[in-house]
Amino acid sequence: MQQPLIILGIGIVLALVSNVESGVLRKPVDEHEYEKWTNARGNEAAVPPPKYKMLRYAKKAINEPENRKMSCLFCTFAVDGVQALIAQNSTDNEIAAFLVNLCDLFDVEQPHVCKNIIYAFKDEVVFVLERSVFTPEEICGAFIANCGHSDKPLTHMWNITIPGGKPPIKPWPKIPDNKPTFKVLHLSDIHIDHQYVVGTEAYCQLDSALGTYAMCCRDYSQDSQGAPTNLKDKPIYVPAGPWGMPYLCDLPYQTFESAMKHISKTFKDLDYIIITGDFEAHDSWDYTEDLTRENMNNMTNVFLEYFPGVPVYVSIGNHEGVPQDAMAPHTMPEYDTRGPQWLYKIMSEMWSHWIPQEALDTVQYRASYAVYPKPGLKLISLNTIYCSEFNFYLYVNEVDPDATLEWLIEELQDSENKGELVHIISHIPPGDNYCLKGWSWNFFEIVKRYENTIAQMFYGHTHYDQFMVYYDMDDPNRRPFHFNWISPSLTTYDWLNPAYRIYEIDGGYEGATYTVKDAKTYFANVTEANMKNKEPEWVLSYDTREHYQMADFSPQSWSDLSDKLWTNTTLFRDYVRLYYRNHYNNECYTDYKCRYTFVCDIKKGRSYDESFCDHLTK
């Protein structure tokens, strides 16, 4: 997520709704009353109405140490500055141009990015603001820590009815010896960049005065119209290699193809593949429906070519949306023109190679589905973009978009009644603060209710190699009752080596547990491949059970591991190394706040709740 850019898009909240605030018409403010009005709203200093004074104010503010955090500065400046423009009765185009010029002036991004990111989110955010009750200040506070007044949009709570009658809790099943197992490939966050150019700047933040460029390893020497830019004659600090770069760069196509060739030759006995979302590159300012359709079609053909006869089960990612994360539910006014039905239709067409028509019908409605990859095992692909904080359509009505959690409960209840076990694959881990609080907390309760039925859960989105434990806070011992596998990304974005995971799962016989028996993570050192000018060598990074000396993969074992990470510096250092796939040297091993962040992320089974971490003390 390129947060500074998205915040600029959010700046459109005020930029293009002119006289709308909190869903009611706002009376224009006279120029002579402007300073008194802005100071009354708690601003340290009023922004003078004339446009060029605003830009000088912004430049001064940027150079003050306390305002180095660009996300907050640009969000709050957009709020105050645009309010001043509104007071001058500026047109929508003038206001949009102000934001584009602001982005250009301070070198926040490439010129075409500055323009496109604002117009990409314009219609969605304007539409939502006109129908919501949140002020711009609440929105700034919601998305940026210590900025604005509130995080209310992200922490709105609502409840879904969960059936009672929970069966007695079963202990985590023990996998018997000498029973059949099967192999599953887990890919996530592939993010292929078809505009990756060898030799371009991989460390492009150095070309930005504020270090905010979000997408490197591309040719920015000319703009989208072919005119030369101010980067045309700049020296290259870190040239992009042919096999990808562990910087803010997505994956070159040939590295993706290298991974597919390696996996298909090495693992000829895959039973199926799970992909937990995100095929598109991180250039969200250039997303179009046609480009998404083309990319998804190409990706489907690749898997059909390299893995013929192997089912592929996919969950939708936030980067599949156009704009990014934009997936309006059916309750949204003007759904016919704003809904993602075009995307869901594409997915149903592509996925028809691997899932039956009954499941495709559900895909076309809510981009979720249920299939049976093995007898007695139901696999549920769950659309968690309905909990994304950047799916702005949800701020009109956050309550269970497209009744997806209600549908999930029905599927789980049906499986409980039949004695089936369930795997859930999805994109956004519900414990991540990217997931809205109301959705996350309801999902947490669903997992607790159906903990006997849900055998495993698999996620992506973060790009990191990590895990997440669910704790029963009603239990005096904080019983760990479930956990998430979170797969490392295939993309190198950002500061990572590409990776994938192979699971060996107990199953294929009567009474199987359908839990993971072993998990092995593989990666490629792209820096080494570039230096040798040879195709990457895909090698075993680690065997999870062996590396962490785990007796099993029960929630208790994962909880025990997280406790050891808190107390054992050597183990924690190793965890961080694997987290970044042997690339990033994070020097936070003895820093309390840094270690707290890593370990608390493990222990948070639901978003916006650090009560799970209150025992982590110095």
UniProtKB/Swiss-Prot annotation:
Q: Which UniProt key words apply to this protein?
A: Disulfide bond, Glycoprotein, Glycosidase, Hydrolase, Lipid metabolism, Metal-binding, Secreted, Signal, Sphingolipid metabolism, Zinc
Q: What class of enzyme is it?
A: hydrolase
- Superkingdom: Eukaryota
GO BP terms, alphabetized = ceramide biosynthetic process; sphingomyelin catabolic process
What cofactor does this chain's UniProt record say it requires? Zn(2+)
- Residues in domain Saposin B-type? 68-151
Which CDD domains does the record associate with it? MPP_ASMase (cd00842)
As recorded in UniProt, its EC number(s) are 3.1.4.12
What does it catalyze? a sphingomyelin + H2O = phosphocholine + an N-acylsphing-4-enine + H(+); an N-acyl-15-methylhexadecasphing-4-enine-1-phosphocholine + H2O = an N-acyl-15-methylhexadecasphing-4-enine + phosphocholine + H(+)
Residues holding Zn(2+) 1? 189, 191, 278, 463
Instruction: Give binding positions for Zn(2+) 2.
Output: 278, 318, 427, 461
Q: List the disulfide bonds.
A: 72-147, 75-140, 103-114, 204-216, 217-249, 387-435, 588-594, 600-613
Localisation per UniProt entry = Secreted
Q: In which pathway does it act?
A: Lipid metabolism; sphingolipid metabolism
Q: How is the cofactor bound?
A: Binds 2 Zn(2+) per subunit.
The signal peptide here is 1-22
Q: What is its main location?
A: secreted
GO CC entries: extracellular region; extracellular space; lysosome; membrane
Recall the GO molecular function terms of this protein's record.
Answer: acid sphingomyelin phosphodiesterase activity; hydrolase activity, acting on glycosyl bonds; metal ion binding; sphingomyelin phosphodiesterase activity
Q: Which residues are glycosylated?
A: 89, 159, 298, 525, 568
- Quote the record's miscellaneous comment: Requires Zn(2+) to be fully active. There are two types of sphingomyelinases: asm (acid), and nsm (neutral). Only acid sphingomyelinases have been found in worms.
Q: What's this protein's function? A: Sphingomyelin phosphodiesterase (sphingomyelinase) that converts sphingomyelin (N-acyl-sphingoid-1-phosphocholine) to ceramide (N-acyl-sphingoid base) and phosphocholine at acidic pH. Displays its enzymatic activity when secreted. May play distinct roles in signaling.
Q: Which family does it belong to?
A: Belongs to the acid sphingomyelinase family.
What is the protein name stated in its UniProt record? Sphingomyelin phosphodiesterase 2
The source organism is: Caenorhabditis elegans
